[in-house]
Amino acid sequence: MLNLAKFNWQRDPHNPILPPGLAGTYDCRGCMNPFVLRVGSEYRLYYSGVDADGYHRICLATAPVAEATSFTRHGVVLDVGGADDFDGRWCVVPLVHRFGDTWHLYYTGRHRRTGLGLQSFTGIGLATSSDGIHFTRYGHNPVITGDQTAEFPRNRGVAGGGTILEDAQADGTTHYRMYYTLAVGRPSDDVRVDQEKHCAVCRSADGIGWKGHHVILHPRRSVPSEDIAVAAPFVWREPGGYRMIYCGIGTRWGYYSMSQAVSEDGYKWHRGDSDENLTLTPGPAGSWEEQMVEYPSVIREKDKLRLFYCGNGYGATGIGTATAPLPE
């Protein structure tokens, strides 16, 4: 099995590379939940933009691979749903994967009812596209809901924040596994109840019907960097196994930091015995990331890894990047 890496992330001096937009625009109050793909010589950065009224929409920015800190905004690619829909107020946490000639955009919806906390995030929706830029909703209902695991059959809260991996089958077909966040918290003065989240996985043969949901990471009550929640599992394969960077909420900082885990099969994960798996912590006082660092998206660049993430206020200060040598 892989060992926990000693990542030496170097934060980019230009951070945040995608700050909130101009007053009155679709992302003037925040840029959050980055998900980055390389398409040819270009990076596509899908993210959640927050407008002045608090509506969240899926947006797109692009940059040349050779200039990974110089992004150009292209606006909204998926607007919120109708007033009574599960995604009537927020569309957040994009995850984009290509299935043959069709691009799938998975996103987390939040409805307009208030007072439910994490339970108002009632589904992961799907939109499709022929070019990865112009998307159309696949119906008006989520394709994944939060009540699919044996551990939490009455839960409603669910979020994306993960990845999709492809598994080749003996018959020549491809199956898919999605890593995502199970948001089981309920409104409470106890943050361990209010913000409780777990990491989960499911599988699919077509990217539409998902089954086999089960939890793969729980908060660790003895580890103060993640004794409240674990979320946003970004997973990739390496020779010898699987590696994950995920977010933890803990009493040490009160908000998100980032940690890592390793696995032989992508289902059973090793995190070490304490907080030895911490990989990125909040930045120095007064910085755009002094409060939290969260929602990792990792992409390989030759002999290094590039990490995209958001900062204070769940993206109120924008999106930044950091690089590190490939793990030995």
Question: What are these model-derived regions, one by one?
Answer:
Residues 1-89, 97-160, 165-228, 236-291, ...:
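Beta-rich carbohydrate-recognition and catalytic domains
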